[in-house]
Design a protein with these regions (language model features):
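Active-site beta-loop-alpha junctions enriched in small/polar residues
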Residues: 13-17, 51-54, 90-92, 127-131, ...
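Structured loop/turn residues at beta-strand edges in well-structured enzyme cores
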Residues: 5, 44, 80, 151, ...
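Active-site acidic/histidine proton-transfer and metal-coordination neighborhood
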Residues: 33-34, 38-41, 55-157
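Glycoside hydrolase catalytic-domain groove-lining segments
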Residues: 168-191
């Protein structure tokens, strides 16, 4: 279906898109092989293997489970031949105070994920969203400086997720700022 419509790449959310995979913990090696084979035969690159988790949750147990899920997905990335495992920084809308309070938690999560990615030569990609912990170009710059690993940490850029009504009049400066900070660490663009 994708190839017939002119597509050569996709972001894959296995539990949502593939029957027989109800979650990230019950995936078999045979299923991963079947996925890799099907995409390769169709000539479709899996640009991002989705594993969207709440990586900045203030509840330590929830956040640790989220980090573990992403780290597990990094192994799946290798098995299915995906370029990245991707997530957003949160799973809910946050106030400005909550965003500030959860940025150190997100940074800790990303550092642990990227450490694991480096160990197995995988790559994690984070998607900024304005209403989540990581939603401004300044916070992205700070996070990228803290992580400092261009081989194992990239960015999924969805312009709709970061543009607010207040930013509309200043788009001439807004978009170049995002592109400058993302730089060569772009995993993909959501259109």
């Amino acid at each position: 279906m994708l190839t017939a419509n002119g597509y050569n790449a996709a972001q894959l959310a296995m539990p949502k898109a593939i029957r027989g995979i109800p979650n990230f913990t019950d995936i078999t090696p045979a299923q991963l092989t079947d996925i890799r084979t099907a995409f390769a035969e169709a000539g479709i690159e899996i640009s991002v293997l989705s594993c969207y988790q709440d990586l900045s949750n203030p509840d330590t147990a929830i956040r640790e489970n989220a980090v573990a899920a992403v780290c597990r997905a990094l192994h799946y990335q290798k098995a299915v031949g995906a370029k990245h495992v991707g997530s957003e920084s949160a799973c809910r809308d946050l106030t400005e105070d909550e965003k500030a309070a959860t940025l150190p938690l997100l940074t800790d999560s990303i550092l642990r994920i990227v450490e694991q990615a480096a160990k197995i030569d995988a790559c994690f990609a984070l998607e900024p969203v304005f209403v989540h912990t990581l939603g401004t170009v300044e916070k992205l710059r700070t996070l990228k400086e803290a992580v400092a690993d261009h081989d194992h940490f990239h960015i999924i850029f969805d312009p709709v997720n970061v543009l607010t009504a207040a930013d509309v009049p200043r788009q001439a400066a807004f978009w170049p700022a995002w592109c400058e900070v993302i730089g060569k660490d772009l995993a993909c663009v959501h259109m």
